């Protein structure tokens, strides 16, 4: 029951934020679109990814996203939180945006390629390179597969 109420509250908050953004004249809009994201990644184990991001468009065909967040995991009998910075470069191809991405944690660097639906739902694949193994933790390296949902809070249609 609490989860339903929380979900309903979040949905109402998103719709009210989006509708308020539509009421502003074009000149008042910020060129950055920002919001939270949540996702799943497999890279030597399962990770829940939560972050905040900002996206801007230097022109009509390219988009760049910067994000910072945390990866949550339960491995080897304990919960682990790993901070992460990411940079994504999207090419606008109408509905499906191909992208390249780089993610950096204190332990790995992970280049990725993938496709995104309107830069809202991202599907990526890449390879993680472990450069500093965390103490009492297994190396986080190898093939990685991820899916993420980016929730724009100040998106405008025009």
Residue ranges and their predicted role:
Residues 1-26:
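Bacterial Sec-dependent N-terminal signal peptides
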Residues 32-42, 62-74, 93-107, 122-131:
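Transmembrane beta-strand segments that form the barrel wall of outer-membrane beta-barrel proteins
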Residues 21-59, 65:
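Short glycine/proline- and aromatic-enriched beta-strand/turn motifs that initiate or cap beta-hairpins
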Residues 140-158:
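Outer-membrane beta-barrel "beta-signal"
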Residues 36-40, 50-54, 70, 85-89, ...:
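Residues on the lipid-exposed face of transmembrane beta-strands in outer-membrane beta-barrel proteins
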Residues 47, 82, 97, 108, ...:
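Transmembrane beta-barrel architecture of outer-membrane proteins
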Residues 57-61, 92-95, 118-122, 152-154:
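Outer-membrane beta-barrel channels and translocator barrels
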